[in-house]
Amino acid sequence: SRFLAMLCAESLIACGHPAEAGDLLARCAAAFGSDQRHQQLAALVLSRTGRLEEAVTAAGRLLQRYPDDDETAGIAGGIYKRRWDRDATQTKALAKAHELYRKQWEKGKKINAYLGVNAAATALYLGDAEGARAIAGAVAEAMDKRDGALAAANLKPQDGGLAEYYDRVSRAEALLVSGRTDEAATAYAAAFADYPWLAGSIEGTRAQARRIAATL
């Protein structure tokens, strides 16, 4: 089914096999056509396989079709940030990434931790250390409040898997940008140890953590 194919493609990307995910997405499109999730993952595959100009074009199409979607903003922001990662002269791409992350985070009442920490990181890269710390602090505070409310109801914020991995490393990144480096290191190490099979996601997380640490 389309649903299972999308889950498998997402897992392949997270485990560090974007080319295989691209093959699966192509077969899925031939069988079922394309939808929003297919287009998002296809753009992510282009970025992860180094086809950045195609990825930027795909990101532009996604933003036109789904302008107020958290996942679209996150993927498109990541593509623009990767363009800057590859070429430090692409400061407009970095500014675009920051704009996407921050605006969508604010539209969502500052609930989405992934968008928030990336807004903080890109603010830091743009030279706004004070703004970055403010955003990161707001993210950490919101996550603490959420977890406190869930604990009171005997619930967990995530139920395992990729979503929980990103939740945990988002907290670690918020701590790092806030200057709480020892706590961040502990949080990163625990997440990496609990999800060692997510090699592709871990590689990206580590790269961003190294860049943040070098910029602080």
Label each region the model flagged.
Residues S1-E10, F32-L44, R48, P67-R86, ...:
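Amphipathic alpha-helical repeat scaffolds of TPR domains
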Residues R27-C28, L62, Q104, A191:
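Canonical positions in the second alpha-helix
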Residues F32, Y66, Y101-Q104, G108, ...:
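Alpha-helical junction/boundary sensor with strong preference for TPR arrays
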Residues L124, G137-E141, T181-A199:
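TPR/TPR-like (Sel1-like) alpha-helical repeat modules
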